[in-house]
UniProtKB/Swiss-Prot annotation:
The gene is hisF. Keywords: Amino-acid biosynthesis, Cytoplasm, Histidine biosynthesis, Lyase. One of its GO terms (molecular function) is lyase activity. IGPS catalyzes the conversion of PRFAR and glutamine to IGP, AICAR and glutamate. The HisF subunit catalyzes the cyclization activity that produces IGP and AICAR from PRFAR using the ammonia provided by the HisH subunit. Pfam families: His_biosynth. The keyword Amino-acid biosynthesis applies. One of its GO terms (biological process) is L-histidine biosynthetic process. The lineage of its organism: Bacteria, Pseudomonadati, Pseudomonadota, Betaproteobacteria, Burkholderiales. This is Imidazole glycerol phosphate synthase subunit HisF. Coiled coil: none annotated. The active site is at residues 11, 130. It is found in: Cytoplasm. GO terms for cellular component: cytoplasm. Its EC number is 4.3.2.10.
Length: 266
């Protein structure tokens, strides 16, 4: 069994790392370069850097900050937020990223995943999915087949601001078919709440795709990380709040996962 990965996440806006609850109420967590260096030293398996307002603000990639972060870490670095084109992938890889993450752009133009994967390989193309459990009203929504959507999760774009009406599990499967090498799956309902992953969502997507799934959104304890793997079927677990504010270190997280029988790199 392959080692399961622990991935701290840097949500960046205005050149600072922030953390919110349910994608709002953002709170400052510090300088991205300093925080990245800290996680590298703590033994994180990978690092994810998301420019969370690039798409909604219509901004370009913040390459200087990405270059500075990349210079501090010697573990795989995934960069997302405002990634729109195959050319953006090239620019990010040149800036020091190892993987690039598409979200809203893949929804607007799914072909970009085929093109980016064909050119650079599936191993460096991640598709991020921001999923939210359907409300009772959303469940009644009629699909193209004339049937009500029913229970499940919808995909949101533009930093969680816009409901696309796409089914999260079906969308993940389509992205994997088109060449995504990994799915970064965030539960918007759980984001920042510290109430644990949405394990039903994680399991549904993990079972539906042949590529690794990174569970994100809701970690409040070290056992939540282990649950993402053992109950959710995730290949990697991503967390922000519990690491940023010093509640736990990556080393403590790995120790707890190992105690729970999850294979990790210690």
């Amino acid at each position: 069994m392959l080692a399961k990965r622990i991935i701290p996440c840097l949500d960046v806006t205005g050149g600072r790392v922030v953390k919110g609850v349910n994608f709002v109420e953002l709170r400052d967590a510090g300088d991205p370069v300093e925080i990245a260096a800290r996680y590298n030293a703590q033994g994180a398996d990978e690092l994810t850097f998301l420019d969370i307002t690039a798409t909604s603000d219509g901004r370009d990639l913040i390459l200087p900050i990405i270059e500075s972060v990349a210079s501090q870490v010697f573990i795989p670095l995934t960069v997302g937020g405002g990634v729109r084109t195959v050319e953006d992938v090239r620019r990010l890889l040149n800036a020091g990223a190892d993987k690039t993450s598409f979200n809203s752009a893949a929804i607007a133009n799914p072909e970009v995943i085929n093109a980016a994967s064909d050119k650079y390989g599936a191993q460096c193309i991640v598709v991020a999915i921001d999923a939210k459990r359907r409300t009772a009203e959303d469940e009644q929504r009629m699909g193209a087949d004339g049937r009500a959507a029913g229970p499940g999760w919808d995909v949101y774009s533009h930093g969680g601001r816009k409901n696309t009406g796409l089914d999260a599990v079906q969308w993940a499967a389509e992205m994997a078919r088109r060449g995504a090498g990994e799915i970064l799956l965030t539960s918007m309902d759980r984001d920042g709440t510290k109430s644990g992953f949405d394990l039903k969502l994680t399991r549904a997507v993990s079972d539906a795709v042949p590529v690794p799934v990174i569970a994100s959104g809701g970690v409040g304890s070290l056992d939540d990380l282990a649950d993402g793997v053992t109950l959710g079927g995730a290949d990697a677990v991503l967390a922000a709040s519990i690491f940023h504010y010093g509640e736990f270190t990556v080393g403590q997280a790995k120790q707890r996962m190992a105690e729970r029988g999850v294979p990790v790199r210690l």
